[in-house]
Amino acid sequence: MTATQTITDSRIHRARAFVLRRPVLCAAVFCLLSFTGFWIAQRAAQVSMVDLLVYRAEGWTVRNALDLYDMRATRHNLPNTYPPFAALLFTPLTVMSTGVLRTFGTAVNLVLMVAVAHLSLRLIALPARVPRPAAVLALAAVGVWCEPVWTTLRYGQINLLVTALVLGDLTRRAGHRWAGVGTGIATGIKLTPGLFVVFLGLAGLLLGLRRLRAARAARGRAGGGPPPQRLRNDHLRRAAVATTAFVLTVAFSALALPHDSRRFWTEVVFATDRPGDVEGAGNQNLKGALARVLHTPDPGMWWLAAAALVGCVGLATAVAAQLTDDSRLPNARAWAALTCAVTALMVSPVSWSHHWVWAVPMVLLLAVEAVRRRTAGWTAWTVVTGLLFCSFMVWYAPHSRPTRVELHQNPAQMLLTAVYPLIGVAFLGVAAYLTLRAVRRPWHPLRPWRSWRSREGIGPLGRQRTTAGAGADRTYARG
């Protein structure tokens, strides 16, 4: 070994020792450098943040009492596609100049990236040796460079806000009075999160029926006894709160903007081509992929059949995982939440690539599973999935809205522009397999690694380690 190699090895050893001693400080510096580089890169790319400008135009339209759905904004003549409640929330943006608005939008989305990382780590158990603040900052520093997050900030989109609202709800403790409000508000802003309300409602209904059957069977064996348990449970309560919050957003919008509300719910909501061309490369869902494969802007019954199949399988898997104990399926609540999210993205008529910010908790879950299982297959799948989300592959093929070149793709181009739906199908397939295997597995005490939540008594090994029936009622509340 040469003197140079010795010095290099010594420096590497000292650097590693410093990182282990000061993980939070190192992660904070890493996150700051990453965000700074991201900000510089976006400014160098001269991102337009065009969707943020559309949001401001929506707020301006509301302030001036004009027709919200006749509005066109920016040189691209982009329409409003969101419920009127979103436009009411956008009115404060009208006081900002374009430069201030872009700075504000970037800063808020970077903060929301940290929030999504934090909530993802509340949903998914990490080994105890990983400090939570360091993990949050490191995840945010890396996640900001994946294509869905980059494109969200490039356009000034609200996907991170919607994801944070839903994750914030799902990670609240069981019985929290506000659990469900965030999902209801998110649905009032952007309708797709409404599938989480359906998911929680189905989980609560099945759990309640299971309890009633168990109680009646116990009474029959005992020859009487106390009355059966009530159907009500935390899942149903969250679904009811979310539904109430959503209805309130609709009612508030109807009072403030009666004409626009009536037009949205009777006309605009059914115009699935209003956000853009279905076959566009950025439309990363079943409908977009089928439109490109079939060379038609309307895949018709092919899409309806595929969406029905994926929707049913995805919802059934999510509900089953939600009602499965962690001893049978580690991180069961995370599998349930992400299965529901991927299902919503897959069956929605329009799911632009930036809607896939759920890639951050998805890749985190796969990484945790790869570390827990220690198999080459899981490691390879995690690495490949992460690289695909960071590859910007969906934009490699020719894409141009005026000429609609996506209707004339060759097989290689179809594959490139179907990368997110293919990841979604693979994820749902694995989730369904793991969940089916878990529900057939007998219960046994949970013995994974000790997570950071275990030390606080609120993780898989803490006060919420229960039997399958009781564990199913705590939804995602672990943090």
Cite the ranges covered by each PLM segment.
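Central hydrophobic cores of alpha-helical transmembrane segments
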Residues: 183-186, 242-246, 338-342, 378-389
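Primarily membrane-embedded glycan-assembly and transfer machineries that use lipid-linked glycans
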Residues: 2-178, 204-353, 409-412, 417, ...
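Aromatic-enriched
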Residues: 367-479
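Membrane-interface alpha helices of multi-pass inner-membrane proteins
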Residues: 177-201, 340-347
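Membrane-helix interface "capping/anchor" motifs
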Residues: 172-180, 371-378
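Alpha-helical transmembrane segments and their membrane-interface exit regions
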Residues: 166-170, 191-192, 271-273, 363-369
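Hydrophobic/aromatic-rich transmembrane helices and adjacent perimembrane loops
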Residues: 353-367, 423-424
